[in-house]
Every structure is written in C-alpha cells, then in structure tokens.
C-alpha cells in the first residue's frame, strides 16, 4: 500500500513538471477602441436633431492618418457637447504629437454626423481585423 501511495505521489509531482508553459493571452482589442465604438454608436443612434448644428469638418483619409487625423479634424468643433467624449478617447488613441501627423491637406468638408459614421466604420474594421 505504501508503495502504491508513493507511486501516485511521484506521478503527481512529475505530472506537474510536464505541464505546458504559461498560456499566452489572446491579444484582445484595446479597451479604448471598444469605448470609442460604443460612444460613436451612441452618437449615431441618438440623432433626433442635427449633430453639432450640422457643423462641417475636414474629411480625412482615416486609413492613412488613423485616429490622429480624426482627432485633428474634430479639434475645431468646440461647442458640441455630443463629441467631447469622442475627442477625449481619440486623444488617448492617438500616440503622436500633432506636429508629427503627416497628412495631405484636406480639401473636402463633410457634416460631423457623416464623419462620425465614417469613423465608426473605420473603428469597427480595426476592432475586427486588428491594426
């Protein structure tokens, strides 16, 4: 009986040594990106009146400039409470200084509501397919 208990304990100890190493964490999309998607979804769903009094912003190429370009475009909108949280989230997602953002000069203006929808689609693609 003692030999049997010793064998079981030995196997248990050796089994612990043979277990695989630490399990890699799956790389989940950043929390800030999820927050941005939620915020943009809320903004686009709650449009009973015109967003930001139909203010216009520069249309930017989000695939080239990313969140920094979006933030730069929305910076000139100051009197619109609906997008303040979006601006704060974009500020956290933009990891470059404003002077480092190299983008072609914009030539087209679009309504803020259209820009927000465009930014929402871009963010969803990043969330699905990664950076």
UniProtKB/Swiss-Prot annotation:
It comes from the Eukaryota. Disulfide bonds join 52-80, 68-94. GO terms for molecular function: cytokine activity; interleukin-13 receptor binding. Keywords: Cytokine, Disulfide bond, Glycoprotein, Secreted, Signal. GO terms for biological process: cellular response to cytokine stimulus; cellular response to mechanical stimulus; immune response; inflammatory response; interleukin-13-mediated signaling pathway; macrophage activation; microglial cell activation; negative regulation of complement-dependent cytotoxicity. InterPro entries: 4_helix_cytokine-like_core, IL-13, IL-4/IL-13, IL-4/IL-13_CS. Glycans are attached at residues 42, 53, 76, 121. Residues 1-18 form the signal peptide. Interacts with IL13RA2. Cytokine that plays important roles in allergic inflammation and immune response to parasite infection. Synergizes with IL2 in regulating interferon-gamma synthesis. Stimulates B-cell proliferation, and activation of eosinophils, basophils, and mast cells. Plays an important role in controlling IL33 activity by modulating the production of transmembrane and soluble forms of interleukin-1 receptor-like 1/IL1RL1. Belongs to the IL-4/IL-13 family. This is Interleukin-13. It comes from Rattus norvegicus. The lineage of its organism: Eukaryota, Metazoa, Chordata, Craniata, Vertebrata. The gene is Il13.
């Amino acid at each position: 009986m003692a030999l049997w208990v010793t064998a079981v304990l030995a196997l248990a100890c050796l089994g612990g040594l043979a277990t695989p190493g630490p399990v890699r964490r799956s790389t989940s999309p950043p929390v800030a990106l999820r927050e941005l998607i939620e915020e943009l979804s809320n903004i686009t769903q709650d449009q009973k009146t015109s967003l930001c009094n139909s203010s216009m912003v520069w249309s930017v190429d989000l695939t080239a400039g990313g969140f920094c370009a979006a933030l730069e475009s929305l910076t000139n909108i100051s009197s619109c409470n609906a997008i303040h949280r979006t601006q704060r989230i974009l500020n956290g997602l933009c990891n470059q200084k404003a002077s480092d953002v190299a983008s072609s000069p914009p030539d087209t203006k679009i309504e803020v509501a259209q820009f927000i929808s465009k930014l929402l689609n871009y963010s969803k693609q990043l969330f699905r397919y990664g950076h």
